[in-house]
């Protein structure tokens, strides 16, 4: 019993010492609720062509593959809340990691990207 208690205590201590990245992966329903919150900045990290085909309303385009992504995020407020997405969740996951490495503290990634977003019936806008 003492060994079990010691293991539990050790696990809790280690969990408390782990670094928090600030990133949270959300499904499309949770992501929809997050982007509706006041003050949340929505970032689309797809290409300009993909963005033009349809994007989440209010999203700002910062192309992850442009070669200028790090410079563009350097101009953003690192303490703001960001909801980040792409086509499938791959690029946005990489973008979130890059943002974390740059010191961003409150970043949300949409799992499944606009593919899952559209399949779930959420709207995409063109403008």
Question: How should each PLM-predicted stretch be described?
Answer:
Residues 85:
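Short, surface-exposed ligand- or partner-binding patches at beta-edge/loop junctions that are enriched
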Residues 2-8, 12-40, 49-81, 90-127:
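Rhodanese-like catalytic fold shared by cysteine-dependent sulfurtransferases
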């Amino acid at each position: 019993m003492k060994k079990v208690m010691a293991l539990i205590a050790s696990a809790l201590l280690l969990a408390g010492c782990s670094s928090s990245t600030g990133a949270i992966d959300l499904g499309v329903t949770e992501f929809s609720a997050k982007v509706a919150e006041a003050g949340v900045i929505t970032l689309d990290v797809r290409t300009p062509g993909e963005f033009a085909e349809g994007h989440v309303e209010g999203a700002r385009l910062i192309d992850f593959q442009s070669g200028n992504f790090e410079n563009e995020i350097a101009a953003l407020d690192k303490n703001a809340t960001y909801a980040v997405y792409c086509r499938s969740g791959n690029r946005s996951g990489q973008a979130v990691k890059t943002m974390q490495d740059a010191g961003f503290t409150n970043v949300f990634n949409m799992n499944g990207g606009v593919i899952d977003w559209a399949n779930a019936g959420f709207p995409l806008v063109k403008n």
